[in-house]
Amino acid sequence: GGGAGGLGGDKTSNFGEPGKGGDGRSSSITGSSITYAGGGGGGQFYDDSVGAVLSGGVGGTGCGGDGGIMPPSGQVGFNRYAVAGTAGLGGGGGGGGAYFAGGNGGSGVVIITFPDTFPDAQAVVTGGGRVFKFSAGGTRTYVFYGDGTLEFQ
């Protein structure tokens, strides 16, 4: 799957390595460089008659999940389940291999920055989540994680 900063990769052949997830996009809005929204890696189906690599596609930078695989008949120990994208960074889930489900996408984040010359507001969260507030370099920043609603009063 594609990410915020780039397209996902193509598989190398019909039975080759599955596509890599697209890279996410880096941002320093919180004061630290963090890469968000990487794409999930492609899933893999193993064909006993042809043979194939034994892994799913790698997730993109920005916490995209790795793809899963349908393993060879009767064999265990392979990463058969796709990996979810990382919570709070918005990464895409990895693709499922054959009969297995794909990974869930990671929850996102809302980041709001404005000049500290504006009046301060109280951030109120309803329905689940948390908000962090900090000031630096003449700005005020709110970082919201969760699945609820953020309102300023």
Please annotate each region the language model reported:
Residues G1-Q153:
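Low-complexity, glycine/proline-biased repetitive segments and flexible coils/loops
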